[in-house]
Amino acid sequence: MLSAALLLLPGLPLAGAGATEEPTQESGPLGEPPPGLALFRWQWHEVEAPYLVALWILVASLAKIVFHLSRKVTSLVPESCLLILLGLVLGGIVLAVAKKAEYQLEPGTFFLFLLPPIVLDSGYFMPSRLFFDNLGAILTYAVVGTLWNAFTTGVALWGLQQAGLVAPRVQAGLLDFLLFGSLISAVDPVAVLAVFEEVHVNQTLFIIIFGESLLNDAVTVVLYKVCNSFVEMGSANVQATDYLKGVASLFVVSLGGAAVGLVFAFLLALTTRFTKRVRIIEPLLVFLLAYAAYLTAEMASLSAILAVTMCGLGCKKYVEANISHKSRTAVKYTMKTLASCAETVIFMLLGISAVDSSKWAWDSGLVLGTLFFILFFRALGVVLQTWALNQFRLVPLDKIDQVVMSYGGLRGAVAFALVILLDRTKVPAKDYFVATTIVVVFFTVIVQGLTIKPLVKWLRVKRSDYHKPTLNQELHEHTFDHILAAVEDVVGHHGYHYWRDRWEQFDKKYLSQLLMRRSAYRIRDQIWDVYYRLNIRDAISFVDQGGHVLSSTGLTLPSMPSRNSVAETSVTNLLRESGSGACLDLQVIDTVRSGRDREDAVMHHLLCGGLYKPRRRYKASCGRHFISEDAQERQDKEIFQQNMKRRLESFKSTKHNICFTKSKPRPRKTSHKKKDGVANPEATNGKPPRDLGFQDTAAVILTVESEEEEESDSSETEKEDDEGIIFVARATSEVLQEGKVSGSLEVCPSPRIIPPSPTCAEKELPWKSGQGDLAVYVSSETTKIVPVDMQTGWNQSISSLESLASPPCTQPPTLTRLPPHPLVTEEPQVPIDLSSDPRSSFAFPPSLAKAGRSRSESSADIPQQELQPLMGHKDHTHLSPGTANSHWCIQFNRGGRL
């Protein structure tokens, strides 16, 4: 767009370049043949216009690079000042060589091509919440302030002429000075943006000044057109209805421009909703429709700046949610590049245009009077308007803010382009107005731009400390918004918070569902996004710590705006796409067919696994037990399970079941000896081994540390408290070892319980008996967190595990003797009667209890009640209390089919 825009640069023979006469072949004398084929031909006129445009942009870019080579220069002098000075130098060189000014800033080039990218960039990336929070102050300064500055400056200059302080050769009346006051009083958005972005004042002050420079365009356009029409008509022909039409045109131009921008914003958001399969055209649609809004408003004589500002401000929320991450990046950098190039060309052409002395005439009284009046009336208007606004603002604007606002009223290329558009036949003093405008622009951009940063430092103005708000800040901000809206609703006052709350409800109910893609609308909740990220991180940690080939780099954690839906980036899908063998939910993958059902299933499992179920509320009753037994039991079980998870989170799990201390870890020597009593699955009945599932080939290990190790790693545990429970899947042969590992690494072996009796399936299917040991290491320290009153719930949980296996055989079970543990003294085994309590889940042999007493005599005072909930009702007498701080290996022989 910028390249096409600069094709209309003044001084370039663009029309002539396109319409150059084709060379005619001059024939020689009669009968002579035409000249032969030329090997080389210079065709400068065919490429002159685009070549010069490319050269200007290249020179401007190289100049910016040179300026930023010295950090000291750019920290003291604004970039806009350096570009204007560069334009003056280049204009002087061109004037000295060509003896005339070749290049100038034409109004058509400026308004149609150079200004739109700057305004679009400002409106699209404007903080909408901050803008609408200060909308009242912005409109006050933009409308009332601009009207005040225009009329007071024009009347004061007319009075100055009547007093004889302006030369008589300046032939201008009251309408002429009002016309000049309307174009010179508007704050320029390009100059404000160029200067204040380098000063870094606080966001409230910046949004008020910059918002004023954007919204005062409607007032400037109306005043300029009305005064220009009055000048062309003549003061004698102006009637009362013309004044009324001028007032009405203010509302038509401003509201019409805003309406045009909102219509194109709606079309842009609606169009990007259906670009999921053609992502490549998304950036093109953004620029085309925004530029179409500007041209439409300009065509209808409405405020084009206001139209493109409202278009960018209104469509960003929906467009950012619909387009892809790459498209957002392309839109951002393309828009910034176009705005930077246009701003650079504008300031350079301002400097070049000032060299041409044939288009301006000098009058000291007019120039000095204009400088004084625009500064004085600007400061007076800011003080009066701020006093009125502070009567209603919760956070008033202090005197320091008023000084910066008064000093920050910069004028720029908008005023220069408007004064160039004046008709010299209708306005005889045009040359004097042009010279005065150039001086005012140079003074505000160079002098005020150079001194505003030291002024801000001297006044100690609050600087901007922009940072991404945390989740806590966002929660409190939303809470305060709802509270203030509720207070206004209660007292019956429909204020700002009430209407903002109503707008948010309307947007959520209608606009977002219409203009945003369904997947984008469902995932835009920031609180849910945080929960989603935490679950993804836990899943990555689970896969990484579980010993699988997949590492944490194999799972990419997408950002919130970049993913299309939760189902597309769920943990299960990430594992499947990366070729992982781990599957978090097999049933979801096997049964779900539609994307919506898959998304709901994944979210259901995530919420059920990480959140408490809602507590039931019961009405008060006169009875002692008014809660039903089933509900109370279910809630107690859930609380117990959640407490178990939290306690286990404080323990550090490792990949090889090793207890780390502060000393440097050393590699552990694994034992390759086979356990006695375990059948070899490779030669069962002379058949090849079958394809075993993960429950038949590996054991699930829960690594739990002792109290000493927990204290030594307390600092590391606090840093990793949000990683969740980590399950380490390893082969059983790697778990059992023969002795201690050298150094501070130690494997804590534990005795095993007697396996349950073989089932009918194992009797009928011989290969079922070769499953191996499936052991679960659980520290007896965890039994301390089991309350005594939860014994029934624990036994029911153990019974539910047994119920998953095949039905037991009707024949009486044959009890086998356990082989002696490598680290436990072998003693004669005593058979244990399991028929007394069929619900008992496990039992400890007396020999192991005696071994426990021999190892830890000092802990004999620990009460037996601590281990009671983990045992059956009839097995308490076989346990020694001296084993409370030991590690136990509890083996559950699961069935071959679940």
Curated annotation (Swiss-Prot):
Superkingdom, taxonomy of origin: Eukaryota
GO molecular function: arrestin family protein binding; sodium:proton antiporter activity
Phenotype when the gene is knocked out: Deficient mice are born at normal Mendelian ratios without gross abnormalities in postnatal development. However, deficient mice display significant enhancement of learning and memory accompanied by an increase in the number of hippocampal excitatory synapses in the hippocampus.
Catalytic activity: Na(+)(in) + H(+)(out) = Na(+)(out) + H(+)(in)
InterPro entries: Cation/H_exchanger_CPA1, Cation/H_exchanger_TM, Na/H_exchanger_3/5, NaH_exchanger
Biological process annotations from GO: regulation of intracellular pH
Cytoplasmic-side segments: 1-48, 98-106, 159-176, 225-249, 301-334, 385-401, 453-898
Extracellular compartment spans: 70-76, 128-137, 198-203, 271-279, 356-363, 423-431
Location relative to the cell: Cell membrane; Recycling endosome membrane; Cell projection, Dendritic spine membrane; Synaptic cell membrane
Skewed-composition ranges (Basic residues): 663-675
Record PTM: Phosphorylated by PRKAA2; promotes its accumulation at the cell surface. Phosphorylated by CSNK2A1 in a manner favoring its beta-arrestin binding and endocytosis.
Keyword field: Antiport, Cell junction, Cell membrane, Cell projection, Endosome, Ion transport, Membrane, Postsynaptic cell membrane, Sodium, Sodium transport, Synapse, Transmembrane, Transmembrane helix, Transport
Ranges annotated as biased composition (Polar residues): 857-866
Tissue: Highest expression level is detected in brain. Expressed in hippocampal neurons (at protein level).
One GO CC annotation: neuron spine
Residue span of region Disordered: 660-693, 826-866
Regions crossing the membrane: 49-69, 77-97, 107-127, 138-158, 177-197, 204-224, 250-270, 280-300, 335-355, 364-384, 402-422, 432-452
Keyword Cell membrane: yes
Topology within the bilayer: Multi-pass membrane protein
Its biological purpose: Plasma membrane Na(+)/H(+) antiporter. Mediates the electroneutral exchange of intracellular H(+) ions for extracellular Na(+) in 1:1 stoichiometry. Responsible for regulating intracellular pH homeostasis, in particular in neural tissues. Acts as a negative regulator of dendritic spine growth. Plays a role in postsynaptic remodeling and signaling. Can also contribute to organellar pH regulation, with consequences for receptor tyrosine kinase trafficking.
Subunit note: Interacts with CHP1 and CHP2. Interacts with ARRB2; facilitates the endocytosis of SLC9A5 from the plasma membrane. Interacts with RACK1; this interaction positively regulates SLC9A5 activity and promote SLC9A5 localization to focal adhesions. Interacts with SCAMP2; this interaction regulates SLC9A5 cell-surface targeting and SLC9A5 activity.
Family: Belongs to the monovalent cation:proton antiporter 1 (CPA1) transporter (TC 2.A.36) family.
Name of the protein in its database record: Sodium/hydrogen exchanger 5
Species this chain originates from: Mus musculus
